[in-house]
From Swiss-Prot:
Keyword Repeat (UniProt): no
Record's keyword terms, sorted: Cell outer membrane, Membrane, Signal
Subunit structure: Component of the lipopolysaccharide transport and assembly complex. Interacts with LptE and LptA.
GO biological process: Gram-negative-bacterium-type cell outer membrane assembly; lipopolysaccharide transport
Role of this protein: Together with LptE, is involved in the assembly of lipopolysaccharide (LPS) at the surface of the outer membrane.
Pfam families per the UniProt record, alphabetical: LptD (PF04453), LptD_N (PF03968)
Protein name per the record: LPS-assembly protein LptD
Organism of this sequence: Shewanella oneidensis (strain ATCC 700550 / JCM 31522 / CIP 106686 / LMG 19005 / NCIMB 14063 / MR-1)
Family recorded in the similarity comment: Belongs to the LptD family.
Signal peptide positions (record): 1-18
Residue stretches spanning the membrane: none
Superkingdom per UniProt: Bacteria
Primary residence: membrane
Keyword Phosphoprotein belongs to the record: no
Amino acid sequence: MQIRYLLALSLLPKLVLADESPATSASQCLIEPPVPRIVSQPGLSAADQAKIRIASDRSKAEMGKQAIFTGDVVFSQGDRHIAADEAILDQATEQFDANGNLVFQDSNFTVTADSLQAQMRSNRATLTGAQYWLHGQQVHGDAEKLQITINNNLILTNTNFTTCPPDNVSWLLEAEKIKINSEEEWGEIWNAKLRVADIPVFYIPYMTVPVSDKRKTGFLYPSFSTSTTNGFEVSAPYYWNIAPEYDLTFTPNYMTNRGLFTKTEFRYLAGEAQNGRLNLEYLGSDQMLNGSPNRYLYNWQHQGAIDKNWRVLANFTEVSDNNYFNDLKSDVNRATDNQLSRIGEVSYFERDWDISTRVQDIKVLGEDEKPYQVMPQVNFNYRAADFWNNLDFGFNSELTNFAHQDDDVNTATRLHMAPSLTLPIHGPSGSFTSQLKLMQTNYWQEKNNSKFDSLDDTVSRTIPQVRINGQINFERFTELFEHNYRQTLEPQFQYLYVGYEDQRGIGIYDTAQLQDDYFGLFRDRRFSGLDRIADANQVTLGITTRLFDDHNQEATKFSLGQIFYLQDSKLGYEDNIFEQNQSTSVLAAELDTRLSSNWYLGAAIQYDTNTSDNKKTEVTLDFRPEANKLLQFSYRYVPDLLNSNTNDLVNISQAGVRGAWPINDSLYFVGNWYYDLNETRSIETYTGVQYESCCYAIRLSYHYRIKTNYDDNIGSTIIDEREQFESGVYLNLIIKGLGGSGPLGVSDMLNDGLFNYRKPLYLRN
């Protein structure tokens, strides 16, 4: 005889929610049932697992009628057990009743109840006066009645549950009815009331919750916030599980100062190796702006592979106005982003060659001058290692058509080809690489305005390049500050010759000057893009030294380098791109060091030895005694930086401090403060306090930040009428077991602001 209801009862672990993450089910938070666990006999065969064993002090049975068991009754089948004072089995109707100190256990949960009534023929069972505990988790609760239906679903009546310890129930969810669908692994809750500190704080007439990682249509948990710009905000996301490969999340977000802001995110899988996302955001009649304009965003992202050789990529974003990201919390970009990238690319790869075609359009928010559009660009690259007598052969080419939204701006088609021969020599003591390259570029330009008459209709530019790069590795053992180290000394040099061609007849389509940091000193270009290839006859000298401790961990890295120009660049005189021709570049230095077991220093400087001017400085000092403790001081200085909002040159001189520190085992503090030394004002302040217990986590945070405002291209609001600063208070609450898997985490608090936390060290550990 098989007691099938025992199998049905094993569904009870899916009673309320999916398993908590390991971090939230630590041993100190586990809640064990008050009854002893019955340990199953290990090593049973499948046949033995299916057998039913009944033990009791007394029994009375008659064939085909009732069997009565009394006194310490124990029914066992595999790892499932029922203990009771009394049990009656009606063999004719297959009705099984048990009562008196009733306990049901399996490997997943324990249930105590006043009585059990089970109909084995229909696979139904009812437990009254039930209390349940999930093994290895924190979930436990009561139910006046617990029913197992014919479809192995669960129905709990007048029930409650919590993840808090019994002696300190911080929160409790009471419900008139909970229904668990075992097939869809989803729960429905009716007339739920959330109690916090035994005070009812929230009533939910109906809600759905997942009881596994399986996706299911339903409302997600709401969120609340407030700020000086948007007022009080409340959002209530709705998730729609359309199909295994499609889903959609719709989030209505109401802001008291602006109105109803809706977000829609559609995600999809296309085959086994492609995926994408579509975002639509809309705010109708923004009440904060003059004229109450409509504001919107749409974004499409797609990426993936087709077979083993093809790759596809797409990213397109459009917004209604320049200040969209600055005013509204978008799911696509951050408030500091002012560029919208629109890219479509298809690539094909083989071992020795690849080909790709790409279209690109970049929209810069707040700028009247629009960048050129790449419509399209085709790239072909070929490489052959050890092509002939240890020589590597390479061939890079591109064909690009530059278009523009304005009809009176010149456009062009550019063809570039660059074959190269490289002789690489590598060894443990160093490397020596020689390269010859010939760069051939052709332009066909359309002059759509008389101000571009100086440009040539067609251009053929041929520029040779010679590049020789070498590095030597020295090593020794030394003692510094009473510590033993292995020190390396890595001098590096590069000779670069690039021929000269008059390029005044070529327009500027995708070219900008590159930064002269230490690694930039060893580039073969001064500019990105191909519209300007600066002639060069120069030598770069650099040196890097590293210290490794007894555990072969890199403790310090210091690099210093500079370019020495053997000949002035003629390109600077023609295009006024360089301020003046100098005999040397900036002196670039970078330092990363572990000062002690807890203190770390990172610094970089670019110093103009010709004018004795500091061109750029960045310094960070970190104190990290433990993984969850951080204190960081930072400073950065950048002179003559172009403000894209006003087209003025500004000096950036900013200092900041950032900290993350546990006050005790449950309370955590995170904060940052950044100050503009030139403007003598704070540009961002963020303070957050987070408390976490075994059953809930709460975070209270405050932020104050400067806003990067642009002239609105919608409505009639001018930049002077917009708020320069924004402040707000945020309250986040996670009730563990009620849609949150906790903890809230610290990394997102560190990155919740204008300035993300950046670990400054790049030591090779």
